[in-house]
Amino acid sequence: MGKILVTGGCGYIGSHTIVELIQLGYEVVCIDDLSNSDGSAIAGIESITGVKVKNTKISVGDSVALQTFFKEEGPIEAVIHFAAFKAVNESVTFPLKYYQNNLASLLVLIETMKSYHCNNLIFSSSVNN
């Protein structure tokens, strides 16, 4: 089985997805800028699965860091993308922040995937009122 990148993997949904992927036999790598989490989920994943998962603290919108990550970790077979802001009230107050993080960074991710011939993307989003 191939290597899967989970963005936002230190969050609730991302960390649970990583556990499932490991249990299915995938090698998983994670990136999370820790803006909405503290990274403690990584220890929980290891406790549950017995597998040490590497989290690299970078933003999906940082093109240079993302390119470096793909180069060092590749080949990556697929990306499951959870790295997005989700608070509706905050998005109304700070729309540019949400645009940059949720849309512009997604475009950086897609361009990087294209450069490294990673053609499989699962995009998921949740919301918090």
Short names for language-model regions:
Residues 1-129:
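N-terminal Rossmann-like NAD(P)+-binding domain of SDR-like oxidoreductases, especially those catalyzing
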